Amino acid sequence: MLDTKYPEIIPGPPKPSAILQPRVFSLPPGTERYVVPGAGAILLRLETGDRIEIENTEGGQPCEIVCADLLGGFDAGLIGARAQGAPSGLMALLTSDDPSLRGLRMGIEARGLNLSQAGAVHLFEHSTPAGTTESFTASREGIVIIAAPGGIMDFQAQDTATPLTVFIRRAVLKSAARFELPDPLADPVADIRVHSATAEAYFVKAGDYIQILDVDGRQCTDFQCFAARKLDKGIAHALDVTTTRTLMGHAYPMPGLHAKYYDQEMQPLVEVIQDTCGRHDAFALACAAKYYDDIGYPGHINCSDNFNAALAPHGVAGRAGWMAINFFFNTGLDDHGVMYADEPWSRPGDYVLLRALTDLVCVSSACPDDTSAANGWNPTDIHVRTYSGKETFQRAVAYRPTPDAEPKMTKQTGFHDRFARFTENFIEYNGFWLANCMSTAGPIEEYHACREKCVVLDLSALRKFEITGPDSEALCQYIFTRNMKTLPVGGVVYTAMCYPHGGMIDDGTVFRLGKDNFRWIGGSDYGGEWIREKAAELGLKVLVRSSTDMQHNIAVQGPESRELLKKVIWTAPHQPKFEELGWFRFAPARIGDDQGVPVVVSRTGYTGELGYEIFCHPKHAGAVFDAVWEAGQAHGIRPMGLEALDMVRIEAGLIFAGYDFSDQTDPFEAGIGFTVPLKSKPDDFIGREALIRRKEHPARVLVGLDIDSNVDVGHGDCVHIGRAQIGEVTSSMRSPILGKNIALARVDVAHHEVGTRVEIGKLDGHQKRLPATIVPFAHYDPQKTRPRS
């Protein structure tokens, strides 16, 4: 008989896809999140019944709240609270010239508020634990101003200013839209809503600004423009992405030096000033009828037809498919040359800010594609605002320390104006504009000045965190690989910080300011997040607060740096004299004399030379730089940028995150095994067991390479013995002093012996090879005699 048994099946109904997304997309409807930056403030509108919750994100940050009704009357009772004094912290902030407070000033002026007559609700103390919250409910409509006051940080008191997080839970949803439109950057000239699956054309004068906003996030928008004068002559030369890519040398322009879009005659049309997303498409056409026809959706509405309809009144002939820059469209080319697309990176409120370089006729669409992930499977609206050319907007991109973080726009360091005297070549690095090289010299001259005389460079983008409290030493001992119990007050130690599996989170330095006072200086914001998370998990009595914006720093490096700074740095009698400062030691100091600008000076650096770093509040940066620069004239001082810094650090074998190590690399594989005292450190630390295993059974080793060729080698180039790949290049440079091409590479432990001959693969890794030899690490002064001198 036939077997009549039913086949096995997968039981039950289907389950939804498990997708983890940034918190902004998972907030319940009617809930909004805002961040008040340290030493900053925001203005928010409240309606009856709205609930507001304020979180002391990092701990220890006081808060001031000013409430006003719709008539401008101040009343803390609007949120059921009582005023406890004047908003002195808020008023002090508003006297500063901080551009981030521009929108707040506009809001206060527009409402005619006189803060000198206001009372403030004061929340939190300097000892308030991280994560502490206070909640209020609005009894009627009005506005609240929430401030996180902060002044010039005392480096020894470590009284930094840190963010507050604000949640508003609306009693009544304002509209059908999930997300509200952010406030304008200035007074708009035009406010244009581009509804889903439509396009709008608009005119923009030369010099004016165009802000293109993604209202709800994950929404693409094609943008096209024409020089109005050409259109008047019947010439419809549109923005040409092929010409633009060729002239800019980038997939698409970004704020900075490579920021302009051109037409086919190479006339610049617009310049990118700000970009909070950083992911766009300049390869594919705007979606067209043929695309939908070919995938089985004939008659589907499309951006090209919408462009044709919007541009027809301006005398522009229709096209079957429009070339465009598709803002927020997430595309790329894989290793096989296949173009792919996925959900956009854009969040609600993300935008691109352009400046018109000539009178323009523009058109913007809200892409209708609901057949793919191009719009997150849910097409929504786009919004366009234009602003007068009389407004001033700094060039910036958005930086998010973590996926859940609110965007931070690129900042200028306190030293920016001083370096801008020598160059316009600044690059975005970790949320700051830093000089790449000097137009007055160039990286080779800067390199030689560092090796032979002295240089000054801006390293303000380094992340600083204040670790304070009775359990601070215990926390540092557990978090960092080095032994913090042996670190004296006034001492600095270079260390790694690892995950439990032994992979590195970051490398950096720890300063000990007191018995219970430490400062971590590393390369990433996440290092501080990790330290704070561990403190909370362990229940330790310690605060971990960011101070990056309170401490900007220059490095003065080179053989003559000590003689130079002897003329500049004053230390108190109970501190070591500057010239007595030992390697990896620091001291609070002042510029010039006991009345000078307060600084912290450390004998540390990232060049392989004798050198120092000077930390100060951004407001004092100009005075610090000027004093160093003036004293340095007799010592041949030169400004140095990141390009030359990369050269000297590679020669000296100093590692760089993202190149020489990652979270898949342990300190031994990164060449800094000396930071892991497995036998001498008496206490456990995160990653110890994994590091013991990795040390006893190594897989890869960081080595030096001497390359028998002047052909440039790059990060990620493969290293071979015969057909087999045995490693990859992590960093490389052409050494002026050594007179050869050198590199750092991570190779299999089976082939790491000095003298081993290898080949570096170019092109596809096989068609072109560069012979090289494994040499001792590091190439330049491996015993570090120069920084010790």
Swiss-Prot record:
GO terms for cellular component: cytosol. One of its GO terms (molecular function) is lyase activity. It catalyses: trimethylamine N-oxide + H(+) = dimethylamine + formaldehyde. Keywords: Lyase. Signal peptide: none annotated. Its EC number is 4.1.2.32. The keyword Lyase applies. InterPro entries: DUF1989, GCST_C, GCV_T_N, GcvT/YgfZ/DmdA, GcvT/YgfZ_C, TrmE/GcvT_dom1. Coiled coil: none annotated. Disruption phenotype: Disruption mutant cannot grow on TMAO or its upstream precursor trimethylamine (TMA) as a sole nitrogen source, although it can grow on dimethylamine (DMA) and monomethylamine (MMA). In the C-terminal section; belongs to the GcvT family. Catalyzes the conversion of trimethylamine N-oxide (TMAO) to dimethylamine (DMA) and formaldehyde. This is Trimethylamine-oxide aldolase. It comes from Ruegeria pomeroyi (strain ATCC 700808 / DSM 15171 / DSS-3). The lineage of its organism: Bacteria, Pseudomonadati, Pseudomonadota, Alphaproteobacteria, Rhodobacterales. The gene is tdm.
